[in-house]
């Protein structure tokens, strides 16, 4: 259960002259196909010099399969719609009560380092959780953000139980990023049982509400934006 080294470099502040990142929050539930179409349009525009964008959404219940997904990890294929996606990673769940942040940035304006970008997304989640007195942690062999659960039984190898609270999956096109992260605020955790989340069966899944924090999505969004700005720089409201 080794943590990543503490000197991990994740700064993704923009170069001088870069315009603020547009910050957009969707109303209601967004169909996955519509989200992908929106990302495709935005990524093309950003690649041509348009302003970068972070888009916060919630989806209806669905599963997505990343480029490394193993068919055997889709335990209940008929439970919810399943979408193949070009992001990295394996199967994951999206649904109401989960904040999905689609992060569309031009790394040529920042730092052309994919590993640092992934670490930066993890850092945004870790700092968001810290504002709510939750300790999120990285793991060397598992992408995402994890929470230790000392109240749960030990794992078979004798180590402390851990649950995943945030998942990451990204894709790049000409150094423009899309897809992003999902943070479990108050989703129905039983919905994760239809898959082996991210191909990892040893560990569970948790949420802020599951951890005893009855937070509202709007409160999480405020903290998420503040954390994002410390890692990626200034944002501006987008219609």
UniProtKB/Swiss-Prot annotation:
It is found in: Cytoplasm. The active site is at residue 198. Residues 48-236 form the BPL/LPL catalytic domain. Keywords: Acyltransferase, Cytoplasm, Transferase. Pfam families: LplA-B_cat (PF21948). InterPro entries: aa-tRNA-synth_II/BPL/LPL, BPL_LPL_catalytic, Octanoyltransferase, Octanoyltransferase_CS. NCBIfam families: lipB, PRK14341.1, PRK14345.1. In the reaction, the free carboxyl group of octanoic acid is attached via an amide linkage to the epsilon-amino group of a specific lysine residue of lipoyl domains of lipoate-dependent enzymes. This is Octanoyltransferase. It comes from Rhizobium etli (strain ATCC 51251 / DSM 11541 / JCM 21823 / NBRC 15573 / CFN 42). The lineage of its organism: Bacteria, Pseudomonadati, Pseudomonadota, Alphaproteobacteria, Hyphomicrobiales.
């Amino acid at each position: 259960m080794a943590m990543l080294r503490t000197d991990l470099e994740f700064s993704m502040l923009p170069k001088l002259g870069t315009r603020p990142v547009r910050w957009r929050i969707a109303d209601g539930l967004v169909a996955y196909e519509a989200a992908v179409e929106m990302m495709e349009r935005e990524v093309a525009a950003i690649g041509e010099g348009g302003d970068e964008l972070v888009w916060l959404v919630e989806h209806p219940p669905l599963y997505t399969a990343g480029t490394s997904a193993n068919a055997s990890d889709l335990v209940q294929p008929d439970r919810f719609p399943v979408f193949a996606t070009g992001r990295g990673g394996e199967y994951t769940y999206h649904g109401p009560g989960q904040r999905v942040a689609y992060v569309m940035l031009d790394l040529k304006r920042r730092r052309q380092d994919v590993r640092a970008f992934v670490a930066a997304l993890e850092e945004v989640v870790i700092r968001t959780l810290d504002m709510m007195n939750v300790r999120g942690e990285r793991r060397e062999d598992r992408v995402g953000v994890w929470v230790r659960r000392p109240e749960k039984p030990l794992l078979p190898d004798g180590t402390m139980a851990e649950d995943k609270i945030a998942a990451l999956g990204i894709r790049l096109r000409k150094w423009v990023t899309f897809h992003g992260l999902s943070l479990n605020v108050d989703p129905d955790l039983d919905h994760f049982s239809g898959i082996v989340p991210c191909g990892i069966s040893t560990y569970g899944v948790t949420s802020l509400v599951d951890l005893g924090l009855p937070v509202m999505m709007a409160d999480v969004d405020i903290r998420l934006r503040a954390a994002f700005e410390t890692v990626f720089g200034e944002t501006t409201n987008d219609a």
